Amino acid sequence: MVKEIYKKYSIVKDLFSRADDVLGFRLSNIILNGPTAKINLTENTQPAIFVVSYSLFTLIKKEFNINLNQAKFFAGHSLGEFSALACANSLSFDDTVLLLNQRGKSMQVAVPAGQGGMLVVLGKDIDYID
């Protein structure tokens, strides 16, 4: 889905390009074309999710003329906190991209590729899960 938005809106292309410049590699190519193995490396996943979410926020704000400057607060969970901070202008786009790349590298070192995982269980009580 982001590929179509990327193609259609120059503001999104510009932010993807800016992230590429900040990082010194083509994160945009990884986001748009993969391969999956590269996007699944958390050093890429972290800034990629941010770049996409921040691009969509900026698109809504500027292209569709929605005034989000009146927002009383921005919130996010985990990685989303960084998007919220950048959208609230508490962190710059460039600093957030670099920070999340480093955060991803640190997380990757803590859990080597192919080890560990994540699971979500919805709608079951604890006795069923045990």
Please state what every model-predicted region is:
Residues 1-75, 124:
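Helix-rich "cap/lid" substructures immediately adjacent to catalytic or cofactor-binding pockets
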Residues 14, 48, 78-79, 91, ...:
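An amphipathic alpha-helix/helix-turn recognition signal
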Residues 21-25, 87-130:
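Alpha/beta catalytic cores of group-transfer enzymes, especially the acyltransferase/condensing modules
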Residues 36-37, 73-79, 104, 116-120:
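Short, glycine/charge-rich beta-strand/loop segments that flank catalytic centers
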Residues 53, 72-76, 80, 84, ...:
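Gly/Ala-rich beta-loop-alpha elbow adjacent to hydrolase catalytic centers
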Residues 56, 81-82, 106, 126:
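A short acidic, glycine/proline-enriched capping/turn motif at secondary-structure boundaries
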